[in-house]
Amino acid sequence: MVSIRLPDGSIRQYEHPVTVAEVAASIGPGLAKAALGGKLDGELVDTSALIDRDASLAIVTDKDADGLDIIRHSTAHLLAYAVKELHPDAQVTIGPVIDNGFYYDFSYHRPFTPEDLEAIEKRMQELAKRDEPVTRRVVSRDEAVSYFRSIGEKYKAEIIESIPASDEIKLYSHGGFTDLCRGPHVPSTGKLKVFKLMKVAGAYWRGDSKNEQLQRIYGTAWTKKEDQDAYLHMLEEAEKRDHRKLGKQLDLFHIQEEAPGMVFWHPKGWTLWQRVEQYMRRRLDAAGYLEIKTPMIMDRSLWEASGHWQNYRENMFTTESEKRDYAIKPMNCPGHVQVFKHGLRSYRDLPLRYAEFGSCHRNEASGALHGLMRVRGFVQDDAHIFCTEDQINSEAIAFNKLAMSVYEDFGFDRIDIKLSLRPEQRMGSDETWDHAEEGLRNALKACGLEWEELPGEGAFYGPKIEYHIKDALGRSWQCGTLQLDMMLPERLGAEYVAEDNSRRRPVMLHRAIVGSMERFLGILIEHHAGAMPAWLAPFHAVVLNIAESQAEYAQTVVQSLQKQGLRVSADLRNEKISYKIREHTLEKVPYLLVVGDKEREAQTVAVRARGGVDLGVMPVEAFVERLREDIQAFK
């Protein structure tokens, strides 16, 4: 007798061992048809999995997130099947699920073309319509190696050879195609209805640039066509909002080959940068932070003491001078500890909050660089709080409130918060970890925030809160961090005099709100599609004259506005006014002020807001009042 507990708490009993598919069929024909897999005692399994013991079971359908993963995984195998049918000489390697889809890497003697992708996708559709059953068999490692070598799949054989000899190997087959996989997979290819191949990119075998170069075909798969259509529309919108394209269009920045991963900021882009930095500086000052500046290049001995030299050296830029080794700092924390150590600290000095817009450099792989989002040289809104264990909760509460307020001001109102908890290998006592984790939990609770807990995901030296902001397209970006550190103060010898005159180590809270300034500006540009709120925009307004006779008045308007602290320029070119309006509209300037003879005589301006909204004619001071209302909240 096998007893199976279902998600609603009910128990079904069977005389003999049953498969997941048979359990689904016993519940109802609709569920049997919809079943993609099962969750057996928390583990994802195929519908063909045999249950021969008492267990809990949830039937997985396309309404579940796990169901979508199964569909995407199976579609990756369908892709490999289609490629092998059309290009028998291609060698298959790996094909995992990724966010919003999947990819599969192939070794082939020539590049896949867009026409190839069309043909492959068409063949995938044909194979799916055949509704071929997907079967699983378990074999020994040696048997699997022998099989893949016999059909010329050397990459698959190499993967299997790296698996312990005692492990069982799962092979999945549909039609004439067999692949190595942990599974689970859909019961038949007919379940794969909505998919699209997206692009081809380069990759390396096992991710190592020293190995053979492969071709990676990316695809997306969904349960419903409308979901895929929405995703494809989002990608189209994302392409329009690409910060690299807008950076060029709006003349904000550029990156060139002579300085890979380093940004050349143009005047408008640097104005945007300054608006963000000055805003952050005001917020930090009001929150009790002390701004400092630490050296960019420091001796190897400091990086050895901090542990970076041993654990992070391959990501650091190093240099040598007068027989001494130096590193360009990849992060600011060791320097902040040096400032804390410079002088005797008392418990009365704590909490001590040091902030720095610190310039850091990391030797990122050239293939990973991506506009402002992944660079080698960047500035962080970095700060470190030195406090006692008893102050963790209050400092975390203050930081949560500050971070959420900042995100709101920048236009982000959807924030996902994740709390990473103690890993198995860690420093410090369980009591210390209990205190630290509970302090962060209570801080989130006190701020009325919801969060997801990630057991085992914390660093070995302390728990961490991550702040993931969602942009206008629903994409998630991890920006803010609050990392509790019980290690670095000890490694670098930071201490304070406690109330009983003993020497104690402070707790160190690493924290950032925007993170990398470059990356945050890239996110901002894409979130607002380049149309920055007036308080952030490089220019608040541009004054346009209709004819040369109004040029002097236009200049007078500009000077008047500039004297009041507004960022305004004039376009006095001898061009048609429609041409000038179109040009500055494309530059996404918040306000265009048009002046003709009537406006000059009446000492007024005709105001056009972004988006072509005609606000009518008004005195200059009335416009100033309107603009100040627009930006006042962030001054």
UniProtKB/Swiss-Prot annotation:
Annotated stretches, region: Catalytic: 242-533
Q: Under the cellular component aspect of Gene Ontology, which terms does the record hold?
A: cytosol
Q: Name one GO biological process term.
A: threonyl-tRNA aminoacylation
Q: How is the cofactor bound?
A: Binds 1 zinc ion per subunit.
The protein's location, in the record's own words, is:
Cytoplasm
Question: Which cofactors does this protein require?
Answer: Zn(2+)
> According to its UniProt record, which reaction does this protein catalyse?
tRNA(Thr) + L-threonine + ATP = L-threonyl-tRNA(Thr) + AMP + diphosphate + H(+)
Q: Where does Zn(2+) bind?
A: C333, H384, H510
Give its E.C. classification number: 6.1.1.3
Major place of residence: cytoplasm
Q: What does this protein do?
A: Catalyzes the attachment of threonine to tRNA(Thr) in a two-step reaction: L-threonine is first activated by ATP to form Thr-AMP and then transferred to the acceptor end of tRNA(Thr). Also edits incorrectly charged L-seryl-tRNA(Thr).
Q: Which PANTHER family match?
A: THREONINE--TRNA LIGASE, CHLOROPLASTIC_MITOCHONDRIAL 2, THREONINE-TRNA LIGASE
Q: What is this protein called?
A: Threonine--tRNA ligase
Q: Write the gene name.
A: thrS
